[in-house]
Amino acid sequence: MAAGSHGGYRGYEVAREREHDVGVSRRSKEHYHHRHPSRHRDSERRRDGGRSGGRELSNGYSHRRDSPRPPPRRRPSEGRTEDREPGEVSGGSGSERSGERPMKTREPRENGVTRVSKEEAKMSPSKKRKQSPVIWDRNGSQRQARDPVRGIREVDAVVAEIIMHQSHSLPVMSSLSSIGDGHSPMILDVSVDKVQEYEKNRIVDEEEEGYPTMRNILTSRWADAGDEEENVFVPKKKKSVSPVDSIERGSTKKVTSPESGEVLVYNSVRSSSRSSDSGVLQGSANRDLEVEKGDNIDVEKAADDDYPAGHLLDSDFEGEDCRSETPECTRSPRRCINMLQGCRSVDEFERLNTINEGTYGVVFRVRDKRTGEIVALKKVKMEKEREGFPLTSLREMNILLSFHHPSIVEVKEVVVGSNDRDIFMVMEYMEHDLKGVMETMKQPYSQSEVKCLMLQLLEGVKYLHDNWVLHRDLKTSNLLLNNRGELKICDFGLSRQYGSPLKPYTQLVVTLWYRAPELLLGAKDYSTAIDMWSLGCIMGELLSKGPLFNGKSEIDQLDKIFRTLGTPDENIWPGYSKLPGATVKFGKQTHNRLRDKFRAVSFTGGPMLSEAGFDLLNRLLTYDPEKRISAEDALNHEWFRELPLPRSKDFMPTFPALNEQDRRFKKHMKSPDPLEEQWMKEQGNNGDRGLFG
């Protein structure tokens, strides 16, 4: 073929003649009539400003685009074929295009890249990619088709048939011979660059608008795969593909005729599209592949920041498939994190004195060298390191680090020592515990002061129960006080979360003096009512400055309870006879003598309690757990609203903090704790214990 400005279009006509020779053309007027003719009329009105009124000129007469008609035949006077696609416009005469600005032709391609004119360079990238076919009239000038979208897709359909039906006998590059100065023909740019896009969108086109879709983040290849479902089909996901890469991708697909109406079946494209050493990708195709792989590496490097050093990510060649099929493949937790690695060292704290040593740890008063703040440092006992980290300490850390309430002690952080056996919890420092203060006082708390303390205690317990946590060891030594009148609950070593329905738990919880009768009788199905019984014992101790029930054993504890509150039966406590410990025979006590301990008016100096206060205490110490008052109902009790009103925290009595020597020699009357006794027997240590037990 002779080189010239008409070479691209004549090459297209030669291909058309070959198509008619082999009989592979399946185009029909019904196919183009079926594809939404109203869409093309809207496109024409926007392009020509409504001048043609939905009609176009072809060979001297007008017709509507949506009217089915065969392509015009070739005129004898012309030396070439003039078959026109339904989306093309033919120029009738020179006067017909006198009022229009001629369009510049696209220059040939070099290494798969099409050079464009300066006017076209000002267009957006999406418009550069989708250029309209050029139509030549008799005089050699050129005009642009009025509907480039349809024209491109119809040319793509023809060229796709030529490439696939003639590839067995005629190579693609030989059928589309070079023209001019050795550049690729213009038809290759139109066919190969768009044929794959046409195949993917042909079936969906009948339900979509015919105009290019605006690119957004949802169609981006980096869209979050976690928000996609497995069966979602995204036909609008497009990216720039070089011609040679398109041929390589097309060779790996089983493609039916674009007009046969069959669904296109795709084989695996991953290996061919991402293999850089196949020997086929050259020039700009290699550059496109390098950019694509570079993008994958950048994204996965950003995700690699969440993984520890040395963690291997998935192969770059499987990244895109993982995002579209299994979102977990890029988010699977493949790391084992030691939470103690990010903890501060205990050397950053200055030790001041030892506060106490309890059953589950030693407590020090220290100063933070970084901030100068005085905090408490509780060392976790690790004597049984063969069995792993202590479960009691693990539960306490988990609960306290997740809770934030004014009535619950705050754990600021966890620090480590020189070895793995030295682990400390950094807590806010409180000057006193309630038991030590009560033994220092000469007179018991007044009713207004008891109300202030009980309100804070009930608020903290309500917060625990609202978050499905049982403390299971509420006692005066586990309640901390400061000189601002604030009370905080501490020592969550026996606490645990509970659920609904209730599960059986161990009954060996709660210090003996504060243990509920159902636990003493061997019940394993219990709930928040055991904490409310402990609050009743604490309230009575605050009023009387001594323990309410100070038994020496479980049987003695039950006997003291029954002597004060009366012996229960099935009428008072339904299900009492079915408890394991109910077989033990106790002395029959029919009267409740609790009122004898707390008089409404005392002339002997004993504890006083109003009728409303006694009602609250009696409801806290109810035998039946189902009838025992809850923390929320207790907060709304009338006792807190009657005179005398609760005292303000600012006016609560203060006491000097005990130094280490005073704590060492001060003897406390202490409740026998079965857990502590068992711990001491296992460790062979019978020494004295402190306040934080």
Curated annotation (Swiss-Prot):
Positions bearing Phosphothreonine: T359, T506
Domain (Protein kinase): residue spans on this chain: 349-640
UniProt GO cellular component terms: nucleus
Compositionally biased residues, Low complexity: 268-284
Protein name (database record): Cyclin-dependent kinase G-1
PROSITE patterns (UniProt xref): PROTEIN_KINASE_DOM, PROTEIN_KINASE_ST
Composition bias type Basic residues, residue spans: 26-39
Naturally occurring in which organism (per UniProt): Oryza sativa subsp. indica (Rice)
Modification Phosphotyrosine, positions: Y360
InterPro entries: CDK, CDK11/PITSLRE_STKc, Kinase-like_dom_sf, Prot_kinase_dom, Ser/Thr_kinase_AS
Residues modified to Phosphoserine: S500
Enzyme class: transferase
Composition bias, Gly residues: 1-10
SUPFAM superfamilies given in the database record: Protein kinase-like (PK-like)
Stretches the record annotates as Disordered: 1-148, 236-308, 664-693
Database matches in Pfam families: Pkinase
EC number, UniProt record: 2.7.11.22, 2.7.11.23
Protein's UniProt keywords contain Nucleus: no
GO process annotations (BP): regulation of mitotic cell cycle
Record field: compositional bias (Basic and acidic residues): 13-24, 40-54, 75-87, 97-122, 287-304
UniProt similarity note: Belongs to the protein kinase superfamily. CMGC Ser/Thr protein kinase family. CDC2/CDKX subfamily.
